[in-house]
Amino acid sequence: MPKHIGIVACSAEGAALCYRTLCAEAPVKMGTHTHPEVSMHTYPLSDYMTHIRSGNWTQVAELMLSSVQKLATMGAEFAVCPDNTIHQAFDLVTEKSPIPWLHIAETVAQEARSRGFQNLALTGTKYLMTSFVYPNILEKSNISCRIPEGDKQEKIDTIIFEELVNGVFLEGSRLYFNQVIQEFKDKGYDVDVLTLVPTYPL
């Protein structure tokens, strides 16, 4: 019997992609038109951004914990959060959570190991790229992680918050991401971990 999944959402675009992906891929294992029961809860992105910008991860954790408590009440048996940035509050949440969570970086590490990847590049919000979220997890698997240089971090962050979270992805931005990815590839990195809301247009 598949478990009831609870999605702790942050940005609408990221949460929508997570939900669509679950429902699109589940039938491969579960049968036509079949997917697990899924519930979702989200506070406005602005609520999260107020605390993210001030570096108040305790308050970010409180929002996440409130969401997961609502999801547990709905019957969710475990939680996923498709937002990489707020995983900086992950440990503060899980110690009080009524249900278990999947950690997004642990899932990436598992996939990297299965494919034999040793050198990963990481692109995402500046809050994520300069955080411990991925390095701490990847190091346990002897996987290295590299982020873009400072000026590139700022441009990527701007594109995410001015375009991607609003469902917009301009051609110039798409080409810029492809350029950054190609630079990492030329330096010998196995793959770029695109920790951003919808990147499928790439």
Q: Model regions: which residues?
A:
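Non-catalytic structural scaffold of enzyme domains
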Residues: 1-202
